Structures are given as C-alpha cells and as structure tokens.
Amino acid sequence: CKQIIQNHTMSTTSTHYVYQEPAIEFVTVAVQLCLYLEQAEEQERADFIEKMLCLLPLLYLKARLLPKATEEMDGYPERFVTEYEYESMRQAIAQKLGSDDAYLEVFVEDMRYSDEPITAFISENIADIYQEVKDLACNYQTREEAVMNDALVSCLEAFEQHWGQKLLNVLRPLHTLSLHVDE
C-alpha cells in the first residue's frame, strides 16, 4: 500500500485528500496492524500483547489527526473481509489470550440499562477494528481516488461511531495483561 502511494506521489503533484500526509500515515499504520494481526497465530502471547499496545494507540492517534473529507461517490465502499475471515481472526486472538480474552466493560451503551457489569472480549473488539481497517486497505489497493477517498470517509465515520471506542476499551485489559504476562 505504501508503495502505491509513493509511486503515485512521485508521478503526480496531486494534493487529493487520499495522498495527503495524515491519510498516508493513517493507512500505513492500518496496513501494519492488518499484516501483524494476520500473523497473530505465529506470535508469542507477550509479543502480541506488546505489539497491540504499540499499534492500537498509534492507529487511534492517526485516525484522530485525519481531517474530515466528503464522499465523492454514491453508495458504500466495497467490503472485503468475509465473515469467515472475521471469525478466524477473532478465534486466533481468543485462543492466544485464553481466559484473559474476557474483561468487564463499563464504557458500552448497554451499561446504561444494566446494574451488572458487561462482559466484553478483546478478540471481538480487535476483530471489529481489523475488519474496518482491512476493508480500507483493500479499497486503497484499487488506486482509484474516489474509492480510496470514500473508504477513508467510511472508515473515519466507523471510527467515530464504534471502533474508536472499542480500541480504547481494549487498551485497559491489554495494559493489565502486559504487566502480568509472566504469571
């Protein structure tokens, strides 16, 4: 993905939103996260936790730094992550974390209507994030500015609506796990 962007910026003086520095940096981190998650099964548990504690906050920061853009096409960007891929990702992370996958969450909408803590899962939240940023990365590979633009717009809207909060929510339990990784 980074090579696509570099090739384009070398061959043109385009200042389109999708080639501006904040967009390039966000997509670069998104691609790094996707590549790492796709190799999650091969990673040691401690390394996985540590890498998530580095990549997720960086992804959050890069998303926050993205300026607003407007859609250029009708409809929604193409979705690439299948239900099977999503579930495989979720299961790989859940297996890696074992019983530590579940955590009590208070920053969810359902908490308003409950006196009991809500159980959430690191694996599910990370799989949700993966789905959004992988779809973005795949749309970027089309090299069509309008498609890339609308994929960024859609990903940023989803960030504001749900996956930004999910990202922040998993940092707490991941931080705790990182402190007790040897136990």
Protein language model regions, located:
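Solvent-exposed, charged interface segments at domain starts and junctions
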Residues: 14-38, 101-124
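Charged, amphipathic alpha-helical oligomerization/scaffolding segments
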Residues: 25-32, 51-58, 62, 88, ...
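N-terminal interaction modules that seed assembly of large macromolecular complexes
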Residues: 11, 17-18, 24-83
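Long amphipathic alpha-helical segments
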Residues: 68-137
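Generic intrinsically disordered, low-complexity segments enriched for polar/acidic and small residues
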Residues: 5, 14-16, 23, 45, ...
